[in-house]
């Protein structure tokens, strides 16, 4: 049986990346909450 998680960096960034987060109001809210928590990585695409 095929496993459910088939990693793809491109798909990951397109759904959870920085530019997608910035594109919506709720996405910007997520980033602001992560900045408030002083997260070193705001999104999966940031290194």
UniProtKB/Swiss-Prot annotation:
Q: What does the record give under GO molecular function?
A: structural constituent of ribosome
Indicate yes or no for the key word Ribonucleoprotein.
Answer: yes
What Gene3D superfamilies does this protein's entry cite? 1.10.287.3980
Q: Does the keyword Mitochondrion apply?
A: no
Q: Name one GO cellular component term.
A: ribonucleoprotein complex
* Pfam families for the chain: Ribosomal_L34 (PF00468)
Biological process terms in GO annotation: translation
InterPro entries referenced in this protein's UniProt entry, alphabetically: Ribosomal_bL34, Ribosomal_bL34_CS
* UniProt keyword list: Ribonucleoprotein, Ribosomal protein
Q: Into which family does the record put it? A: Belongs to the bacterial ribosomal protein bL34 family.
NCBIfam families membership: rpmH_bact
Q: What is this protein called?
A: Large ribosomal subunit protein bL34
From what organism does this protein derive? Buchnera aphidicola subsp. Acyrthosiphon pisum (strain APS)
Its gene is rpmH
